[in-house]
Amino acid sequence: MASSIVSSAAAATRSNVAQASMVAPFTGLKSAASFPVTKKNNNVDITSLASNGGRVRCMQVWPPINMKKYETLSYLPDLSDEQLLSEIEYLLKNGWVPCLEFETERGFVYRENNSSPGYYDGRYWTMWKLPMFGCTDATQVLAEVQEAKKAYPQAWVRIIGFDNVRQVQCISFIAYKPEGF
């Protein structure tokens, strides 16, 4: 019994020493109530969080029925000659080589022989003449578009801007779509 009293007394002195050397955590800090807390509230309407003053005017850009998506800017109405000239001038200003391509069957990506993308899925069109290396006049490119439209009135015609230094296609847009598309 004496041994049990001694051991319990020794344990008591050890715990007192440990308690005396412990420092209370967060001594001198402010309470947590003053810190900003981010809480996720699942029933908050997100439309009430941001406002631009009610000046939103939404425009449907892509009707999904009976409307194929072709290339860049295809969701817009057909470009006028002035708008085409503006796009061609942008292409030339960046130093890209204009190139015209046309497609007589389908002007959109399709997969007929295989479900995975490949060469025969409508991405590669027939080139109209040669790329216009050295061309600096947008009206010359537009004249070629008019000539391609006259030669193939039921074909899609697109203009490509090719960077011959990096050897990449930088811009591509539809210049002409046949009637009904």
From Swiss-Prot:
<keyword id="KW-0150">Chloroplast</keyword>
<dbReference type="InterPro" id="IPR000894">
    <property type="entry name" value="RuBisCO_ssu_dom"/>
</dbReference>
<keyword id="KW-0113">Calvin cycle</keyword>
<comment type="subunit">
    <text>Heterohexadecamer of 8 large and 8 small subunits.</text>
</comment>
<keyword id="KW-0809">Transit peptide</keyword>
<dbReference type="InterPro" id="IPR024680">
    <property type="entry name" value="RuBisCO_ssu_N"/>
</dbReference>
<dbReference type="InterPro" id="IPR024681">
    <property type="entry name" value="RuBisCO_ssu"/>
</dbReference>
<comment type="subunit">
    <text>(Microbial infection) Binds to tobamovirus movement protein; this interaction seems required for viral systemic movement.</text>
</comment>
<dbReference type="Pfam" id="PF12338">
    <property type="entry name" value="RbcS"/>
</dbReference>
<keyword id="KW-0051">Antiviral defense</keyword>
<keyword id="KW-0602">Photosynthesis</keyword>
<dbReference type="GO" id="GO:0009506">
    <property type="term" value="C:plasmodesma"/>
</dbReference>
<dbReference type="GO" id="GO:0009853">
    <property type="term" value="P:photorespiration"/>
</dbReference>
<feature type="transit peptide" description="Chloroplast">
    <location>
        <begin position="1"/>
        <end position="57"/>
    </location>
</feature>
<dbReference type="GO" id="GO:0019253">
    <property type="term" value="P:reductive pentose-phosphate cycle"/>
</dbReference>
<comment type="similarity">
    <text>Belongs to the RuBisCO small chain family.</text>
</comment>
<dbReference type="InterPro" id="IPR036385">
    <property type="entry name" value="RuBisCO_ssu_sf"/>
</dbReference>
<protein>
    <recommendedName>
        <fullName>Ribulose bisphosphate carboxylase small subunit, chloroplastic 1</fullName>
    </recommendedName>
</protein>
<keyword id="KW-0120">Carbon dioxide fixation</keyword>
<keyword id="KW-0945">Host-virus interaction</keyword>
<keyword id="KW-0601">Photorespiration</keyword>
<keyword id="KW-0934">Plastid</keyword>
<dbReference type="GO" id="GO:0009507">
    <property type="term" value="C:chloroplast"/>
</dbReference>
<comment type="function">
    <text>RuBisCO catalyzes two reactions: the carboxylation of D-ribulose 1,5-bisphosphate, the primary event in carbon dioxide fixation, as well as the oxidative fragmentation of the pentose substrate. Both reactions occur simultaneously and in competition at the same active site. Although the small subunit is not catalytic it is essential for maximal activity. Involved in antiviral defenses.</text>
</comment>
<keyword id="KW-0965">Cell junction</keyword>
<dbReference type="Pfam" id="PF00101">
    <property type="entry name" value="RuBisCO_small"/>
</dbReference>
<dbReference type="GO" id="GO:0051607">
    <property type="term" value="P:defense response to virus"/>
</dbReference>
<dbReference type="GO" id="GO:0016984">
    <property type="term" value="F:ribulose-bisphosphate carboxylase activity"/>
</dbReference>
